[in-house]
Amino acid sequence: MRLFQYVFLIRNQFNLIKLPQVKHFSSLKRVAVCISVDIVAGTRSLHSFSVKMKKTAFSVNRSGNSSHENTLKFSDYDCIGFDLDNTLVKYKLTELMTLEYDMLAKYMVEVKGYDSKYLLMPFSKDIGFVQRCLFVDFERGNLVKLGAKGEVIKASHGTRFLSESEIKDTYGPEQLWKDGLTYIKDPLEAWRGPLSDKVRPLLDYFDAPSALVFARTVNTIDESGDMPVKYNVWPDVLDGLKHMFNPENFDSGEGYFHSMRSDVSKYVHPVDHQVVVWLKSLKQRGKKLFLLTGSGMSFASVVAEHSLGPDWRSLFDIVISLARKPWFFIADKEERPFMTVCEPSLVKENKVAVPQLNCHVRYEQGSWDGLRIALGDANGKENGGKVLYVGDNIIQDVYSPVEYTKCQTVAICEEMGAHMTFEGSDKLVDEFLLSSDWGSFFASHGIISYWSDVLSKYSKLCVPSINACAAKPIDYPFKIGYYPGCPPC
């Protein structure tokens, strides 16, 4: 997941991403129909539930060449990459988002001059309003949950939810949002296009709390009686996000970074020895492991050490920070070279198109075009052989590697944990993951959400936590689809 890529974020309006129209691959092999699923983790039957979810087609990905097309084994891959935030580093989400909300709301009041009546209300009062991957409709002051066909399946104006008739009055009788449809049809070309002034999806837990900041600010404006034809709240929220995640603040000890560094255990789960042992077992089998994170190395080191231990770098053959996904998977090696950084001075020494697999060398930025060559040089296989990438950001970690490279993907979707029990779920699952206001992340009223559709078509396996994988041997055959079971509507 990306984090604290300040210059890049300004250039790209804080990583505004336009979703592609998901293609129905000819390689779709398996249809998962989840009805009265018994979820089994290890040897224990942990949970059982009845679901109404419609057929969910999972692909084996375009590059799938396994003889076991309906299963995934980590042992079948030559190289395996991991995202860091919300993948290997597991955050205490309620605490993290409370911190983010409080700082962003304070910025809106103290810097932008908005009334404090709603903004400084406790985050906990409306925590059920926050859900990952909501769309912000800037001009209308609305938040939108989008269906797989681009239909508005739920929407709010400020924090007030719209009735079905209000949704039709706003978005048309078919409830099809014009900007949402444009967003779906136009993939990354629209990242920096005109739609960036109108629409934004809140793709991760670092910007998800901004939905409530935006909504409460709209409430404030409406209460004043001076309702605008077009709202202009989002640019102020965006300024607050940029300010909060400015990496220069890491060394200055201010704000967000000061809170994280001074009490990392409040926001990050401690070392998970099962995951560490699992990573080591992959390396012992000769797999080349790479860590690819959008976070800056200074911040990444703090949270990685807390989650993976002081020798965390040795778990990987190469560590790359400030990766600037999704462009990492798209650009060529000449366009986006790797930067080698001298420690401890942090001086950028030189640019290299192709890095070396050395966990003690610090790399920033770069491209898949360069990394695949390095992986191939290390294991003697073209492009590194068969490659798997594991991450949580649906666009940066799931869609882009499949669309633009020959990688296959495993999606980490923590929202699954709201519906089922899995290894470690008693410690890892936050109560907010099942939104009391928006309902299931995966569907509403029996209609599959757009994000659920993207996950099903671009990931080979979708799990609630890396723990669900680490609890099994590396040659365990995971059935393609949701594991340990399908989430309900």
Where are the regions that the model predicts?
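HAD-like aspartate-dependent phosphatase fold
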Residues: R2-F4, P20-C489
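Cleavable N-terminal signal peptides of Sec/SRP-targeted secreted and luminal proteins
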Residues: F8-R11
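Cationic, low-complexity basic patches in intrinsically disordered or flexible, solvent-exposed regions
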Residues: F14, L19
